[in-house]
């Protein structure tokens, strides 16, 4: 491929593709670009690309506008054509439906769930409030946020060196 053909290809690429309130890198493949979207990993991206009828190894920015729209529609309607066990929000608390949340909604939904647990004073909510581990991990020796535990050898050596210097100067 000559340099002129390479420049023509680069001019046709959209460097940013907007899907689900997120700018995706148009220079990456469809599968890898979709994986940057919150709530979409490599496996879900592969399923979405196949459902949209797009080659998942094609460059995301090189797709036509109608292909990008079909990818967007496939992301939005993921739960309709994917198995229920693949949804990231199964049996939603409020609706009882299986949903697949993408983009910034993932973090917002997570925060709402944590706040709901805090309000009803569940065990997990109390652990979240206190900043402690929630999922049953050990806390005796890991996850400490305060200063160092035990003997600080460097500080002791510095104090001894200062004491020795002070004692040596007085004699």
Swiss-Prot record:
The entry's cellular-component GO terms read: cytosol; small ribosomal subunit
- Skewed-composition ranges (Acidic residues): 160-171
Keyword entries, A-Z? Ribonucleoprotein, Ribosomal protein, RNA-binding, rRNA-binding
**Origin superkingdom:** Archaea
A GO biological-process term:
translation
InterPro entries recorded: Rbsml_uS13_C, Ribosomal_uS13, Ribosomal_uS13-like_H2TH, Ribosomal_uS13_archaeal, Ribosomal_uS13_CS
Q: Which Pfam families match?
A: Ribosomal_S13
GO molecular function terms listed in the Swiss-Prot or TrEMBL record = rRNA binding; structural constituent of ribosome
Region annotated Disordered sits at 128-171
What family is this? Belongs to the universal ribosomal protein uS13 family.
Q: Which NCBIfam families match?
A: PRK04053.1, uS13_arch
- What is the annotated role of this protein in its UniProt record? Located at the top of the head of the 30S subunit, it contacts several helices of the 16S rRNA. In the 70S ribosome it contacts the 23S rRNA (bridge B1a) and protein L5 of the 50S subunit (bridge B1b), connecting the 2 subunits; these bridges are implicated in subunit movement.
Subunit relationships: Part of the 30S ribosomal subunit. Forms a loose heterodimer with protein S19. Forms two bridges to the 50S subunit in the 70S ribosome.
Full protein name:
Small ribosomal subunit protein uS13
Q: Which organism is it from?
A: Halobacterium salinarum (strain ATCC 700922 / JCM 11081 / NRC-1) (Halobacterium halobium)
Q: Which gene encodes it?
A: rps13
């Amino acid at each position: 491929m000559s340099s002129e053909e390479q420049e023509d290809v680069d001019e046709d690429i959209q460097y940013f593709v907007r899907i689900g309130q997120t700018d995706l890198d148009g220079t990456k493949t469809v599968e890898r670009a979709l994986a940057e979207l919150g709530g979409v990993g490599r496996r879900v991206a592969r399923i979405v690309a196949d459902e949209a009828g797009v080659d998942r190894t094609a460059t995301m920015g090189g797709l036509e506008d109608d292909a990008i729209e079909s990818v967007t529609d496939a992301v939005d309607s993921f739960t309709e054509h994917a198995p229920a066990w693949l949804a990231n929000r199964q049996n939603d608390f409020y609706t009882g439906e299986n949903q697949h949340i993408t983009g910034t909604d993932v973090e917002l939904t997570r925060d709402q769930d944590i706040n709901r647990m805090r309000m009803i004073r569940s065990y997990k909510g109390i652990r979240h409030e206190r900043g402690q581990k929630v999922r049953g991990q050990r806390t005796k020796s890991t996850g400490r946020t305060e200063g160092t535990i035990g003997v600080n050898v460097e500080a002791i050596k510095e104090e001894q060196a200062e004491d020795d210097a002070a004692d040596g100067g007085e004699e």
